[in-house]
Amino acid sequence: MALETCLRGWALYAPQAGIRERLSSGSYAPSRPRTAAPAVVSPSPYKSALVAARRPSRFVCKCKNVVDEVIVADEKNWDNMVIACESPVLVEFWAPWCGPCRMIAPVIDELAKDYVGKIKCCKVNTDDCPNIASTYGIRSIPTVLMFKDGEKKESVIGAVPKTTLCTIIDKYIGS
């Protein structure tokens, strides 16, 4: 998903039409090998546009390691996903049998898409990972914790509206 978003952004800044063709998979790819064309000095603006179209693009994808979906965190990947993460991390503690957890799950999914590239969203099943839950004092579910620089900054207990979580996220993505 992140790569597709990145490629869509790249396609928007393509120099000229015809250099890229839409593939059946929905992604964009060069229609011919990109080689540097020799610069042609010409009084005609049309020829200079053609030369610019043949130049290799200076495309730099800044979407590296960006995920627009909720990632399942467990005891094996907890440190890498949450503690060592440079961006803020929203973690939902949940259980499959919990009704309010099922109500807030779509909200967390939306937040992952709305804040793609700004935060990482993870979820921890408290039945599968009781040690993580007890480390952070999770006694009720759903509980949402906000981490920044590996430290727990804020917590929200219960199925809360999306606006409540957005307010918390906005506090930590700007600072």
Curated annotation (Swiss-Prot):
Q: Which residues cross the membrane?
A: none
Q: GO cellular component terms?
A: chloroplast; cytoplasm
Highest taxon above the source species: Eukaryota
Q: What is this protein called?
A: Thioredoxin M-type, chloroplastic
Q: List the disulfide bonds.
A: 98-101
Q: Which UniProt keywords apply?
A: Chloroplast, Disulfide bond, Electron transport, Plastid, Redox-active center, Transit peptide, Transport
The primary location reported for this protein is plastid
Instruction: Say which species the protein is native to.
Output: Triticum aestivum
**Where, per UniProt, does this protein localize?**
Plastid, Chloroplast
All residue ranges annotated as the Thioredoxin domain in the record: 63-174
What CDD domains does the record tag this protein with? TRX_family
Q: Name one GO molecular function term.
A: protein-disulfide reductase activity
- Indicate the family of this protein: Belongs to the thioredoxin family. Plant M-type subfamily.
What SUPFAM superfamilies does its record include? Answer: Thioredoxin-like
Transit peptide (first-last residue):
1-62
Q: Which Gene3D superfamilies match?
A: Glutaredoxin (3.40.30.10)
